[in-house]
Amino acid sequence: MPAVNLGMPKVPEVLAPRRKTRQISVGKVKVGGNAQVSVQSMTTTQTTNINATLQQIAELTATGCDIVRVAVPHQDDADVLHILAKKSQIPIIADIHFQPRYVFTAIDAGVGAVRVNPGNIRKFDDQVGAIAKAAKAAGVSIRIGVNAGSLHPSLLQKYGKATPEALVESAVWEASLFEEHDFHDFKISVKHNDPVIMVKAYRLLAERGDWPLHLGVTEAGPAFQGTIKSATAFGILLSEGIGDTIRVSLSAPPAEEVKVGLQILQSLNLRERKLEIVSCPSCGRAQVDVYSLAEQVTEGLKHVNVPLRVAVMGCVVNGPGEAREAELGVASGNGRGQIFVKGEVIKTVPEAEIVQTLIEEANRLAAEMPAGSIGSPEILV
């Protein structure tokens, strides 16, 4: 029976059509409508430290970040936004709490968008008209950022705690105020640190209007826990077509947030998949150290930036089948590895040469692809 090479699908399947929303602009990045789901992060530097902040933004840009948010807790931070907005490679969102005057400074600075928290900005409802007028004149969009940790006291009194309904009521009320002033260039987030409550809130919000939605699990936690929480919540919502831009919140370097966010989108076929390592979890049948093999191959191919699936399998049960379905793979056993390329065995090599052979073949395949970007290979054997 001839080998069937599945590899990367030519036309990726998605679980559900994207929800129809209005489209807004955050600087040069489109959000909502038919735009791809964008990935955001937030700097961890002191915003007034311009060089450090721009360096971190450059690192985020290189990682694949589309939009970056910076904290504006003080007037000094607001005063440097015009420099950051001018020099940043990607659009900047100014994150504003408590002080409404910082919103106007940010708009005048030329940022891509301003995030406002209706739960803690002083007399926010009274400021909406002026904010809408200034933002509209400057072509700056707004994010209405509702957060479970800073809901207005009246909503906490009404609902007893930060329920999905409380989050949505806050968001819809503020949206209605902006729309009363003929301002429609905004997106909404209703964040909670419990993925279940967060999912329920976004589902409710999606039913109430055509606003673009920014997905986030707030205060998700350390890298492992936060990744699980965000992947769970985002996976559910995005698979239902809900969500137009995402931020994975981790107690980790910002670039890690971007990597996780991109991987979530790639896993759902909402972004073109890049390098994908398929490796077995190992068991008593494994005849090689699969963990070490997979890690070495991953490290050695981290420079590859094309849709390439590489299977690293440790035995003959699923190994040959998985290897055939990848562009490149190895089925290991008895001190040797069968190397598959596009479904066909091209050679058998000693176990000690598996990693080097896979890296060499991956580089060759990547170079043949139109979007190939193979960088400088790093071989660990």
Swiss-Prot record:
Residues that, per the record, bind [4Fe-4S] cluster: C280, C283, C315, E322
Cofactor binding, note field: Binds 1 [4Fe-4S] cluster.
Any one GO molecular function term: 4 iron, 4 sulfur cluster binding
Reaction equations catalysed: (2E)-4-hydroxy-3-methylbut-2-enyl diphosphate + oxidized [flavodoxin] + H2O + 2 H(+) = 2-C-methyl-D-erythritol 2,4-cyclic diphosphate + reduced [flavodoxin]
Disulfide bond entries: none
Keyword 4Fe-4S appears in the UniProt entry: yes
Enzyme Commission no: 1.17.7.3
Keywords: 4Fe-4S, Iron, Iron-sulfur, Isoprene biosynthesis, Metal-binding, Oxidoreductase
Coiled coil segments of this chain: none
First-tier enzyme category under EC: oxidoreductase
GO terms classed as biological process: isopentenyl diphosphate biosynthetic process, methylerythritol 4-phosphate pathway; terpenoid biosynthetic process
Required cofactor names: [4Fe-4S] cluster
Alphabetized Pfam families for the sequence: GcpE (PF04551)
UniProt pathway annotation: Isoprenoid biosynthesis; isopentenyl diphosphate biosynthesis via DXP pathway; isopentenyl diphosphate from 1-deoxy-D-xylulose 5-phosphate: step 5/6
Biological role: Converts 2C-methyl-D-erythritol 2,4-cyclodiphosphate (ME-2,4cPP) into 1-hydroxy-2-methyl-2-(E)-butenyl 4-diphosphate.
Family the entry assigns: Belongs to the IspG family.
Protein name: 4-hydroxy-3-methylbut-2-en-1-yl diphosphate synthase (flavodoxin)
Organism: Clavibacter michiganensis subsp. michiganensis (strain NCPPB 382)
